[in-house]
């Protein structure tokens, strides 16, 4: 890829105003390969987006090039930062080309959602403007898509694939349904290619019940730890059943703290690691604050790269996003600190955090839209066994046939080592990715790229 440095030349600035207030801001780089901006999705609520046009794009009117909308987890983590620079974007946090960028298979649209994540913001730090539910987050994203797609023929002719990681999966399911409704009512012009759920927090109850047995099986918990874990999981189940969702979120934190203590701080994103291996070490305290959970989500990825041969200022995502990237973009408010409000976003959605969306996945499948699930073998927080448990609760008419299907092995290029398995029936697809934790594109970039190509049906390079 030609891009080895961040583009600095800006060709155009388009600002549309109402009553003297800036509503939408858009910028494009010198060769048109990147565009970014803000959309005011609600009064005083501004959502940031960044679109990369793929240099591998094949112009074929009969088969339009796909575009991927990437949604991060948290809620409160930044897709523009984490998903882009640490996972699938064209450059890594050292601003070096990423060989496994998903631009090889599709255009990429990163969004900081919900508002308050990353570069997105509310005016005057009015916390009551943060969304409180997955439905509200999906509504904001639908408004953003209307602004970006309705008047852009290139975009609205491309199939849009909503790809989500972790908590982003809950919002992605709601967004898929919202997009279908908006398209059918004539409010949105786009073609929904599918919804892809990567290690997604679809059914919190099923996941918390999976943690104890999984960690006992891999020797990170003993019988005492298993019993304690299952006891708190039962409490969470009761709280969810009674609609006590805030209480369930608090008990979820208690359960993570308990498991951390009993397992000598197993990493919830990869059970082969300790959290003490991360830059954010939790070994000094058994009490994990919400903001530390959000920071840990990103800093886990920082730790996957060796920083020993570079200066401390290089490779750090916080410094990158608040430094050279903020300077490049030119439209970020001067007083905005990237990622500074992630905890406020999480707190606002505390009552939504433990709500399941299995019924919404059922509804999505019933529309005929392709739903793809992928899961890393080594993940704990959104474990494969937990994912399989909620999938088996689906009421979709094709579930029994799906369960009967044989899996096919996955390989990476000429390497014949088994990298995973997949199976499909009608519009439900599942990928089991071996050797990967919570962040599949980071741990197994080659097979992840192959998977994305299969999902989007992109031309072979």
Curated annotation (Swiss-Prot):
One of its GO terms (biological process) is proteolysis. Keywords: Carboxypeptidase, Glycoprotein, Hydrolase, Protease, Secreted, Signal. GO terms for molecular function: serine-type carboxypeptidase activity. SUPFAM superfamilies: alpha/beta-Hydrolases (SSF53474). Residues 1-20 form the signal peptide. GO terms for cellular component: extracellular region. The keyword Glycoprotein applies. InterPro entries: AB_hydrolase_fold, Peptidase_S10, Ser_caboxypep_ser_AS. Its EC number is 3.4.16.-. Glycans are attached at residues 99, 152, 340. Expressed in seedlings, roots, flowers and siliques. It is an enzyme of class 3 (hydrolase). The keyword Glycoprotein applies. It is found in: Secreted. The active site is at 166, 379, 438. It comes from the Eukaryota. Its main location: secreted. Probable carboxypeptidase. Belongs to the peptidase S10 family. This is Serine carboxypeptidase-like 51. The lineage of its organism: Eukaryota, Viridiplantae, Streptophyta, Embryophyta, Tracheophyta. The gene is SCPL51.
């Amino acid at each position: 890829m030609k891009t080895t440095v961040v583009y600095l030349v800006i060709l155009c600035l388009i600002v549309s105003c109402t009553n003297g207030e800036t509503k939408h801001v858009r910028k494009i780089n010198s060769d048109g390969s990147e565009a970014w901006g803000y959309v005011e999705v609600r009064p005083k609520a501004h959502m940031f987006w960044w679109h990369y046009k793929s240099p591998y794009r094949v112009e074929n009117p009969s088969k339009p090039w796909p575009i991927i909308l990437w949604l991060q987890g948290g809620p409160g983590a930044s897709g523009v930062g984490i998903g882009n620079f640490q996972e699938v974007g064209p450059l890594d946090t050292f601003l070096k080309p990423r060989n496994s960028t998903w631009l090889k298979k599709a255009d990429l649209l990163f969004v900081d959602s919900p508002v308050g994540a990353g570069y997105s913001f509310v005016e005057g730090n009015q916390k009551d403007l943060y969304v409180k539910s997955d439905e509200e987050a999906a509504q904001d994203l639908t408004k953003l898509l209307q602004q970006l797609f309705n008047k852009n023929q290139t975009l609205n002719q491309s199939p849009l694939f909503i790809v989500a990681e972790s908590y982003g999966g809950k919002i992605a399911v709601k967004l898929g349904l919202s997009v279908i409704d908006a398209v059918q009512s004539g409010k949105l012009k786009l073609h929904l290619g599918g919804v892809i759920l990567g290690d997604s927090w679809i059914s919190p109850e099923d996941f918390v019940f999976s943690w104890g047995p999984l960690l006992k099986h891999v020797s990170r918990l003993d019988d005492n730890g298993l019993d304690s874990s299952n006891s708190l999981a039962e409490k969470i189940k009761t709280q969810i059943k009674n609609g006590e969702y805030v209480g369930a979120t608090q008990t979820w934190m208690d359960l993570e703290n308990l498991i951390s203590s009993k397992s000598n701080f197993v990493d919830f994103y990869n059970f082969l690691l300790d959290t003490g291996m991360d830059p954010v070490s939790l070994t000094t305290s058994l009490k994990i604050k919400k903001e530390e959970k959000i920071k840990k989500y990103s800093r886990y990825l920082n730790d996957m790269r060796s920083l020993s041969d570079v200066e401390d200022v290089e490779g750090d995502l916080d410094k990158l996003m608040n430094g050279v990237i903020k300077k490049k973009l030119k439209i970020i408010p001067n007083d905005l600190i990237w990622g500074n409000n992630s905890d406020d976003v999480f707190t606002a959605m505390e009552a939504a955090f433990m709500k399941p969306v299995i019924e919404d996945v059922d509804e999505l499948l019933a529309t005929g839209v392709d739903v793809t699930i992928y899961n890393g073998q080594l993940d704990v927080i959104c474990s494969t066994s937990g994912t399989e448990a909620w999938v088996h609760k689906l009421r979709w008419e094709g579930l029994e046939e799906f369960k009967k299907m044989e899996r096919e092995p996955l390989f990476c290029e000429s390497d014949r080592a088994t990298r995973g398995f997949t199976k499909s029936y009608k519009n439900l697809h599942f990928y089991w990715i071996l050797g990967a934790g919570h962040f599949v594109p980071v741990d197994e970039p080659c097979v992840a790229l192959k998977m994305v190509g299969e999902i989007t049906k992109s031309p072979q390079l």
